[in-house]
Amino acid sequence: MADQRMDISSTISDFMSPDPADLISSSLSTSGVDCNRKRKGSSTDYQLDGFPFEEGMDTDKDDQHGRLDYADQQGRIKNAREAHSQIEKRRRDKMNSFIDELASLVPTCNAMSRKLDKLTVLRMAVQHMKTLRGATNPYTEANYKPAFLSDDELKHLILRAADGFLFVVGCDRGKILFVSESVFKILNYSQNDLIGQSLFDYLHPKDIAKVKEQLSSSDTAPRERLIDAKTGLPVKTDITPGPSRLCSGARRSFFCRMKCNRPSVKVEDKDFPSTCSKKKADRKSFCTIHSTGYLKSWPPTKMGLDEDNEPDNEGCNLSCLVAIGRLHPHVVPQPVNGEIRVKPTEYVSRHAIDGKFVFVDQRATAILAYLPQELLGTSCYEYFHQDDIGHLAECHRQVLQTREKITTNCYKFKIKDGSFITLRSRWFSFMNPWTKEVEYIVSTNTVVSTSVLDSGDAAFPQLAASPHSMDSVLQAGEGGPKRSHPTVPGIPGGTRAGAGKIGRMIAEEIMEIHRIRGSSPSSCGSSPLNITSTPPPDTSSPGSKKILNGGTPDISSAGLLSGQIQDSSGYPYSDNSSILGENSHIGIDMIDNDQGSSSPSNDEAAMAVIMSLLEADAGLGGPVDFSDLPWPL
């Protein structure tokens, strides 16, 4: 037992106290492990008792692996960039191909002589889509209607509401493709008479160009100008307008004159004294039509037309104008009761000093039924009623002599259908500030309703009927007895042939008065239309018409010619007579009539005084001595 205990104790002691050599070897092995954990940057070789190890070799391997990883990463980034560039390039190429395809589909882009930028192509494409919207919009199609209405019933309702006729005209040649039966009520032509005919054959010659412009307007001339995004300059187009490029769905509204198939009346040639009367009679065969509609395109198969004779169309759609024509009213309806205050129906016109129209407001068409170009160049006296010419001629004289506004009484004016409408005008003259001459007369013409005339309003005085007023004016101007004026066939009564020369006579009369005033010594330096000087006392007997030999005519208030009246401005005008009439001319013959006071000495003295006056007026002489005159001043 004791031996066993000794063996166990020795074993434990050996275990608890190891051999020094074992301790050294274990410590070296532990230190070797620690040396391996030093930083990679060291290149020193450690060697202890036959145990060498190298740290530098491990760090070189790590650096090599790091460089390889960096190169691989850079390669991957480069490959990714190249792949992105290829993707972007393919996207740009695809977009450019789509832009080119879109440009080939848009007519305005396809016809350009140079390549357009992308923004311009897109802008043109958007504009082209807007022009095509009218053809695809269901609200503009004929099938947009209630289900319980048939096509014929809808057509009759539209024509009844519009009070006109429906027509379809081809835009290429103006051929009438369809017209409704209601055209007979307006133009007195049947449906079969117009279908297949050219619209231009039934238009007024002056309106053909306007209608052609309405039919040929296309999307090649848009309202807004296209601007190149790169250069900033407007894009020029070389497109030739064609039927396939018309703006389908574009609205149209215009006025034109069309022939009316009125019953012909056989009139012998002897009834027409001149060709002018024939022209006036032919002018009444046209009526003003207001056409409103839109352009429309149909495939030729839908129209059922034969295209064998149309090789130029190349299978394109047929472009037409679908419109409703309504007879344009010439008189605006007036309110029945005078209680409602409305804007007066009026128009403005401008006349030359002889009364001829030089400008007419467009509102005159709705009142008189004349187009402005029909009135230009004609005299206003041709449209006045013969009972009102005397009063209007007097107003004409006053407006040429004064600067004030002249308001006429109510008078009758002939409209296009031959009847008369009651007007009241306000006239004033425009004077050139440099030449002091009247340039033109401005007239504001207001329509007077029948209810106002019947009420006898004092603000609208009426003229008393005087059948011989025009004859008196013509007789005074011509200086002869009254002559009979034949009535022209085809022109309604109420006006006289030759009335247009009244305005010319009045203009010549006023010009003669201005000339006499301008040549008078007492009127030098003053305007012929603004004479307010006080006349010298008249020593001759009242009512005397004779002028002393060698003297100058004294046109003052005390020495006026017979039948003349002096207005508020001191300017004389005649009452229903002309200053250029018979026994009223001022000339050498009238001066020579006074033989009692004529002698060579008196003539020489008068001539000397006149020459002195001229020299004094020109600043060439001294004061004038009037003591040598043979008559008292």
UniProtKB/Swiss-Prot annotation:
Conditions for induction: Exhibits circadian rhythm expression in the pineal gland. Maximum levels between ZT13 and ZT16 during light/dark cycle. Similar expression in constant darkness. Expression in the retinal photoreceptor cells oscillates in a circadian manner.
Q: Which residues carry this modification: Phosphoserine?
A: S17, S85, S97
Q: What Gene3D superfamilies does this protein map onto?
A: Helix-loop-helix DNA-binding domain, PAS domain
Spell out which residues are annotated as carrying N6-acetyllysine.
K545
Q: In which tissues is it expressed?
A: Expressed in pineal gland and retina.
Record site: Interaction with E-box DNA: H84, I87, E88, R92
Offer a single GO CC term for the protein. Answer: transcription regulator complex
- The name this protein carries in UniProt is Basic helix-loop-helix ARNT-like protein 1
State the organism of origin. Gallus gallus (Chicken)
Per the record, the gene is: BMAL1
